[in-house]
Design a protein with these regions (language model features):
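Acidic/histidine-rich helix-loop elements
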Residues: 25-41
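Charged catalytic carboxylate motif
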Residues: 43, 47
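Short acidic/His/Gly/Ser-rich catalytic and metal-binding motifs that mark active-site loops
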Residues: 23-28, 72-74
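N-terminal nucleotide-binding beta1-loop-alpha1 segment
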Residues: 16-21
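Metal-dependent active-site segment of extracytoplasmic phospho-/sulfohydrolases and closely related
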Residues: 61-63
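Active-site-adjacent betaalpha module
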Residues: 1-14, 49-58, 70-73, 81-203
Length: 203
């Protein structure tokens, strides 16, 4: 597949940070055990901090996308959503549902409301926000690489945005899953940039 390197104007670029919350990222979090080994191997959190800091310095738009459990709705579903409801993961107003301190939103940054399923575009006004901001490029990082990150990236791509996943700022349940997405999914969007690659492309 042909790799396309983009030059991204910062004012036309949105960094979407998916579920950098205590339940995923911190000891004691309800899903931390699922990703602990892999995010250590991938250096996910340190890379995400560099990604956020670099994007801020260059003037890119930042959108934080926490998952906030809708217990009634999720408990009526099957599979992953039902499991989250049963485990009370990302419960509203809980420690586990809070965005981690290292990536704490600044006052002028958007914290998306209403993300209660897989893609950040479903049940939210994310698409409206992006169009109103005049965004052309969408960059996605976070959790889980093969689930919410991938689904959100597909949503952005289908809406016509130049889309990239930043794999070294993502977390999966295993190295095998992470490497599968990096190898088989990320190239579909045009390239597989590291944090450093992206920050060079952003101007």
């Amino acid at each position: 597949m042909l790799e396309r390197i983009l030059t991204m104007k910062a004012e036309k670029t949105a960094l979407i940070l998916i579920e950098f919350q205590n339940d995923f990222c911190k000891e004691g979090g309800k899903l931390f055990g699922t990703v602990k080994k892999e995010i250590a191997r991938n250096n996910t959190l340190k890379n995400a901090v560099r990604l956020l800091d670099g994007t801020r310095k260059k003037g890119g738009k930042i959108i934080h996308c926490p998952f906030i459990l809708d217990r009634t709705w999720a408990s009526s579903k099957d599979g992953l959503l039902k499991a989250l409801a049963d485990g009370d993961v990302f419960a509203p107003n809980s420690w586990g549902g809070k965005i981690i301190d290292e990536l704490k939103p600044l006052n002028d940054e958007i914290v998306l409301q209403g993300k209660c399923c897989i893609s950040a575009f479903e049940h939210t006004n994310l698409a409206t926000i992006l169009f109103e901001l005049g965004i052309e490029n969408v960059v996605v990082a976070g959790f889980l690489t093969n689930i919410c990150v991938q689904a959100t990236a597909w949503g952005a791509y289908d809406l016509g945005f130049h889309t990239r996943i930043i794999p070294d700022s993502c977390g999966a349940a295993s190295q095998g899953i992470q490497e599968f997405v990096e190898r088989e999914i990320c190239p579909i969007f045009g390239s597989v940039p590291t944090v450093d690659d992206f920050l060079v492309e952003l101007e």
